Amino acid sequence: MSKPKDKERINEKRRAKFKELQKKIGIFFTNEKLLIQAFTHSSYVNEHRRRPHEDNERLEFLGDAVLELTVSQYLFKKFPHMSEGELTKLRAAIVCEPSLVKFANALSFGELVLLGKGEELTGGRTRPALLADVFEAFIGALYLDQGMDAVMQFLGQTIFPKIDEGAFSHVMDFKSQLQELVQRDGIGVLEYSILEEKGPAHNKEFVSRVSLNGQELGIGVGKSKKEAEQHAAQMALQKLKTIGKE
């Protein structure tokens, strides 16, 4: 049985970790109970019935909806030439369990989860479904505490940069989008070329260039020719989008 002083020490450590997280993301909760609830698993509540704990399941429900909306809004604005089907496919890749687990692990969310002893013993702290749920619950808690702007600020640190870096390019067909745009506006002919191949056979890197009527539009790097061309097309789309705004 834990002594009161031991419990106090554990609580102090936990509070310090929550403060550390808030400092790391630059967002401080007004209602810290919401923050703690986001990390409270139902197994912990079941084992601490004497204390008024609430689990994170309702927050997860809310966070799931908020995440879908914010990611949808970001994609809608960032990729004006992407079809509804392509946007849906990309959003699904971003908010799927494996992606959410990566985002949660990047912030060491697993260390903060309040778990029941049984769940702890069976490795619940590293269970993908649990980590994905906690990430969604955190979004829900942040939305309730500070609103949509704070959620967008948080996603601007965790998810949106990954989209910009091309982490989900495997589900995005930038070449088709670029081809469609060029054909629609009748602005010329696209041509792809491999500028460079470097690295050993097992870890090659390709540099691709896409040109429009002989003029360079974008350069991309990838582990395969196809990936390099996709990244080059992505850069070209961004360039054409910027020109279109001028």
Swiss-Prot record:
GO molecular function: double-stranded RNA binding; metal ion binding; ribonuclease III activity; rRNA binding
UniProt cross-references to HAMAP family, sorted A to Z: RNase_III (MF_00104)
Organism: Geobacillus sp. (strain WCH70)
Protein name: Ribonuclease 3
Location relative to the cell: Cytoplasm
Subunit comment: Homodimer.
Binding site for Mg(2+): 60, 133, 136
InterPro entries: dsRBD_dom, RNase_III, RNase_III_dom, RNase_III_sf
Enzyme Commission (EC) number: 3.1.26.3
Keywords: Cytoplasm, Endonuclease, Hydrolase, Magnesium, Metal-binding, mRNA processing, Nuclease, RNA-binding, rRNA processing, rRNA-binding, tRNA processing
Domain DRBM: from-to ranges: 173-242
BP term (GO), one: tRNA processing
